[in-house]
Amino acid sequence: VAVGRDNRPSGAALRDALVKGLTESGVDVVDVGVVPTPLLYWSLHHVNVVGGIQITGSHNPPEYNGFKCCVGTGSLHGEGIQRLRQIIEAGQFRSGSGNTREEAII
């Protein structure tokens, strides 16, 4: 999974927690660094990943931040994002040991 973030102050801490959770669930992470959301989307087509998460508050004030999630090359929405919410709320996480690597895409 590619992980990118914008330059909001909370981005680094959210990235650290996200990467920890993903790798402890057996997911391999490619950290593409501080990039705008369109570059995270670009990475889904040009980096060997099965999805991506951009940490961004988008157009919201700087004190807000969140995740834009993708499966394959498309955005996670509708029933898919509701299923993710259910997994998180129930704590139904897989256990594993994923790896992390950094890849500069710009």
Regions found by a protein language model. Give the residues of each.
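Ferredoxin-reductase
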Residues: 1-72
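Gly/Ser/Thr-enriched, mixed-charge loops and adjacent short helices
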Residues: 65-106
